[in-house]
Amino acid sequence: MAKVAVVDVEQELSQAVEDVFAPFGGVSQVLAGRKRAFVKVNAIDCRPETYTSPAVLDAVLKVLRKYGVEDLNVMENCTQGNFTRMVFAATDLGRVCRRNKAKIIYLDEQPVAEMELPGLGERVRFPRLIIEEFGGQEREAFYLNVPRLKAHSMSVVTLGTKNQLGLMDQLDRMKNHNFNLHARLAAIAQIFRPDFTLIDGVKAVFYGHYPPASVVDRCTETLNVLVGGKDMLAVDTVGARILGYSVEEVPHLALAREQGWGCGRLEEIEVIGDLSRFTKKYPYHLLPEFPEDVKIIKGGERCCPEGCELNTKAVLQFLYLDHQGKGGFTILMGKGFDREQLKALRGPVLLAGKCATQEALPIIQNNCSKIYTSAECNDLASTIKALTKLMKVNPLKLVPVSPIRSLVLLALAKLHGSRARVGI
């Protein structure tokens, strides 16, 4: 029977982290003598509450040091439209790593190699370092997955399994980030198995995984809980339960369970700790607040919430709420449009996604004053670039550092080989 520890954070975080490992024989037994460790955080962006808590990361690194880890590495590949070096520089994550003498591995700056996603016949790129360290059965290093406890507008929840999407190269992430997303997440879980997954539930994030800073208090709640175990699917099953969801409501977890990549039945998991205080169902959908003068036309045949629809709406929302972005344009997303409606379109238009671009561009290209395209299912960098122009928002103001420092950091990232797709 899989075991999952649920620890209330009532004392020092370092002690709470140790308490998560305790039911598995303690940190020393889980490490099994390994002196090198890689910690995969969730650091998609530098906006408030979008990343693993620096306090939790600090506690994790201190505990690993205490139990003999000598070569300590923290790794991430942030979301598109940004670059990982920026996220660590603009948040306390970078300072925590330096204080604990942990090396930061910016995965977008690493050389890549191709692997096939099992069962999908799709070849995608991962950092060669990740493939060499964790792509086989035998490993010398300890792999700790530390996601943030979040609901997610495109995947219902984002926990350990979803956190591993950050291992994939950004250029491949934007493709098939549609109805295929859940199958891709389950396939990645088959390739890369963390030795231990520890969910940071100090604060839960909901109404999507990317809350606008101006309304972040409406999108977070302090829970003061850590959840951990060796079986990532079992840990995610318990994490989903804390957020109010069953595995059946989370397609990628249901797929992983069906394919046998862990225990995904709550009744078959030995939960060490108390779940009774978690009684809410935290909404995963976005807040219903968008500029009234932006017209969104969805195709009648298909419009994937996992791709062109909710990625675009999330950017639209935070530019509107946080940066007072202007409207006065149309967004087309999905496929299966009314041809006459397309012919009647005027003014500026954003074609969001591959389907809308392929279907609508030939029809509207001679009628609309300005056309922007985001030509993959989740071409977030192009979406940000287009929407900042349409909404008259300076993209250099999207990060909490000066424009000069932003450009210096970007130059450093490019110098080190960054493949990140930046939205400027």
Identify the residue ranges that each predicted region occupies:
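N-terminal and secondary-structure boundary signal
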Residues: 1-424
